[in-house]
Structures are given as structure tokens and as C-alpha cells.
């Protein structure tokens, strides 16, 4: 899904300020309605676990506003990734530009898998744990392993090599 273009830097900067004390990461500099107060947290959380802020009848993702205000660079055609996968953590140190593919590398594994580790599943026919990884939308076989942890370690090594800082590493 392509993100909505943001209003101008001047417009956003006149109303919002980045704040480490606000749960959303933004405070009101100049409220746009009577419910809002100067220096109070700006934004509301939605079911999908992202912070949003209302501005000129438009719902904006707070992490995109923060990145734009801090870096003052056009982000209309890029994805902003939460490094720690916590979409509520809008600290500027937790936000980075990424491609859609890089963002997919930084996600946890599927919840309905036969393994609790990303990139690992059980092969019924071989009775071994299989490690695999996606590269350029193609599944790449890493190997078969006697135990789940060894397969997870093999996945981690491949993920670090292939995805670098965007790799999601299993906790083993």
C-alpha cells in the first residue's frame, strides 16, 4: 500500500514537535482544535497498533510525521521501518527508511508454523528440521538439521549474510 503524501514541512512543523516524553512521540506545538493543548501528547492509537494524528481532516501515521520532521526530506515514496518491530516505538533512533522487501525481512516468522523460529519448519518425510530463507521473493533452501535450534542458527547465519541490518534473528 502506497503511503499518503504528507503535508508540507512548514505546515507540520508549525503544529507538531517531536517529544521523547509523549507516548506517540509527538506533542502539540499549536493545537488545531479546542480538545488539544499546547505541549500535550498528540495522536491516537488504532487497532492495528500504530499511532495516528489528525491534521487538516487527514489521518497521518505518526512515525512518518516524526521521520519527516526530523530529517526534513521527502518520504512520499518510501517505507519507514520500525527497527525493533515495535510499531508503537516512534523514537527517531528506531525509525529508518527501507524498501518493502527489506521491511519484510525484519518481521517475525508465521505464528501457525510447525516451529517457533522464523525460517524453520518440520519435514515430515525426512523427520528433520528444514531451514530456508526468502531472497528476492524466492525461497532458498539452507539445509536439514537434527534439531530445531541448529536449524534456527543456520537461518540466522543466512539472514545476517543476505539481509544485513534488516535481518530478523531468532532468539537462540
Say what each PLM segment does.
Residues 1-51, 55:
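Short helix-coil boundary/hinge micro-motifs
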Residues 146-162:
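A short, charged, amphipathic alpha-helix used as a generic interaction element across diverse proteins
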Residues 166-169:
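Beta-sandwich strand segments
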Residues 48-50, 137-140:
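Short, solvent-exposed beta-strand edge segments and adjacent coil->beta transition regions
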Residues 4-7, 98, 146:
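Short coil/turn linker and secondary-structure boundary residues
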Residues 138-148:
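A short, exposed loop/beta-hairpin motif centered on an aromatic-Gly-Thr core
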Amino acid at each position: 500500500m502506497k503511503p499518503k503524501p504528507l503535508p508540507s514541512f512548514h505546515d507540520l512543523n508549525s503544529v507538531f514537535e517531536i517529544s521523547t516524553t509523549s507516548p506517540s512521540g509527538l506533542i502539540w506545538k499549536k493545537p488545531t482544535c479546542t480538545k488539544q493543548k499546547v505541549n500535550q501528547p498528540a495522536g491516537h492509537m488504532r487497532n492495528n497498533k500504530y499511532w495516528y494524528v489528525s491534521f487538516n481532516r487527514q489521518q497521518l501515521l505518526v512515525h512518518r510525521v516524526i521521520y519527516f520532521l526530523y530529517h526534513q526530506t521527502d518520504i512520499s515514496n518510501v517505507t519507514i521501518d520500525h527497527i525493533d518491530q515495535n510499531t508503537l516505538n516512534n523514537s527517531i533512533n528506531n525509525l529508518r527508511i527501507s524498501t518493502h522487501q527489506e521491511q519484510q525481512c525484519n518481521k517475525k516468522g508465521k505464528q501457525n508454523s510447525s516451529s517457533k523460529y522464523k525460517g524453520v519448519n518440520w519435514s515430515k518425510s525426512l523427520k528433520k528440521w528444514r531451514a530456508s530463507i526468502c531472497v528476492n521473493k524466492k525461497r532458498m533452501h539452507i539445509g536439514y538439521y537434527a534439531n530445531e535450534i541448529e536449524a534456527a542458527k543456520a537461518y540466522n547465519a543466512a539472514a545476517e549474510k543476505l539481509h544485513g541490518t534488516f535481518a530478523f534473528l531468532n532468539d537462540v
